[in-house]
């Protein structure tokens, strides 16, 4: 009886841990996609030595300001 109880506790622990890990991964991915969508939609200005969206900044037209693609 004791082995059966320990096995059940172990299985519940593994399932709980796996569920929390999956939830954390989904939450971080959703947060990243949300930030990227906001940046792409508004074409925020790139700061010096930093890109707001991706690793590519390009100059557009005669205006020397840089915008994210």
Curated annotation (Swiss-Prot):
Residues 28-36 form a propeptide. Disulfide bonds join 39-53, 46-57, 52-68. InterPro entries: Scorpion_calcine (IPR012632). The record marks 67, 69 as: Essential for stimulation of [3H]ryanodine binding to RYR1. Residues 59-60 are annotated as: Essential for stimulation of [3H]ryanodine binding to RYR1. The keyword Signal applies. Residues 1-27 form the signal peptide. GO terms for molecular function: calcium channel inhibitor activity; toxin activity. It is found in: Secreted. Its main location: secreted. Expressed by the venom gland. One of its GO terms (cellular component) is extracellular region. Keywords: Calcium channel impairing toxin, Cleavage on pair of basic residues, Disulfide bond, Ion channel impairing toxin, Knottin, Neurotoxin, Ryanodine-sensitive calcium-release channel impairing toxin, Secreted, Signal, Toxin. This toxin stabilizes ryanodine receptor 1 (RyR1) opening in a long-lasting subconductance state (55% of the full conductance state). Furthermore, it triggers calcium release from sarcoplasmic vesicles (45.3 nM are enough to induce a sharp release, and 50% of the total calcium is released after toxin (100 nM) addition) probably by acting as a cell-penetrating peptide (CPP). In addition, it has been shown to dose-dependently stimulate ryanodine binding to RyR1 (EC(50)=17.4 nM). Belongs to the scorpion calcin family. The presence of a 'disulfide through disulfide knot' structurally defines this protein as a knottin. This is Intrepicalcin. It comes from Thorellius intrepidus (Scorpion).
């Amino acid at each position: 009886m004791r082995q059966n109880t320990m096995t059940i506790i172990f299985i519940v622990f593994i399932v709980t841990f796996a569920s929390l890990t999956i939830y954390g991964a989904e939450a971080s991915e959703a947060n990243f996609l949300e930030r990227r969508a906001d940046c792409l939609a508004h074409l925020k200005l790139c700061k010096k030595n930093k890109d707001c969206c991706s690793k590519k900044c390009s100059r557009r037209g005669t205006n020397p300001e840089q915008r994210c693609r």
